[in-house]
């Protein structure tokens, strides 16, 4: 993955473009994932790295359901991402994807402005200040209108 990103960055930079890389939220953890995404290597190769720590994508641990704790879940990601950035010689900006859709698992809780604001606050509290992007695969304009207050 890194070799391709270095090649792509060289080509894109010479044409005046930037390169970003999206990675699973899990990749911020201090181990090498089976998916071939190694945070420090990708962060060193791109201009912006975008983790995807959607709370509903994390596994339940006993009674703990990450999708019911958006602040805590994204805070854990942000702290891990900050640690990985610190070990990267020339890290990219961290621009994180956040969940802006209703949880897809039982109890199918609704993600509204409060949950999105919690995710944004968690990123800021951990120093992930390179911005964020909202993921709403259904591109539901009503959802965006309902969370707009959380995006400032």
Label each PLM-derived region with a short phrase.
Residues 1, 63-70:
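Glycine-rich tight-turn/loop motif centered on a GG-T
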Residues 1-34, 89-103, 135:
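Aromatic-lined carbohydrate-recognition surfaces of secreted/lumenal glycan-active proteins
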Residues 3-10, 14, 37, 41-44, ...:
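Alpha-helical scaffolding segments of alpha/beta enzyme cores, especially the outer helices
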Residues 23-27, 38, 46, 53:
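Generic secondary-structure microfeatures
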Residues 31-33, 61-63, 107:
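Short, well-ordered secondary-structure micro-motifs
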Residues 33-38, 65-66, 146-150:
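Short low-complexity, flexible loop/linker segments enriched in glycine and/or proline
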Residues 46-60, 69-152:
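Substrate-binding cleft of secreted/luminal carbohydrate-active enzymes
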